[in-house]
Amino acid sequence: MKLHYYPETDSLYIEFKPVPGAETREVADGLVVDLDERGEVVGFDIDLASKRFDLSTLETVALPLHTTTAA
């Protein structure tokens, strides 16, 4: 799973699978789900993310994590 933040559009993309979406559905105002060809969730796109959430912190609970840092 990867989190991508795009400040130019203030959108947060939560990627569950590294495959392209075949279909998108807006499931709520400003929340789009991407589905693969089998209808499985690939990721979520959240518009106006910084206005909806505090993006300055990220907390995980009981997840087996492998951390990487962006260059």
Positions of the model-derived regions?
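Hydrophobic beta-strand positions
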Residues: 4-5, 34
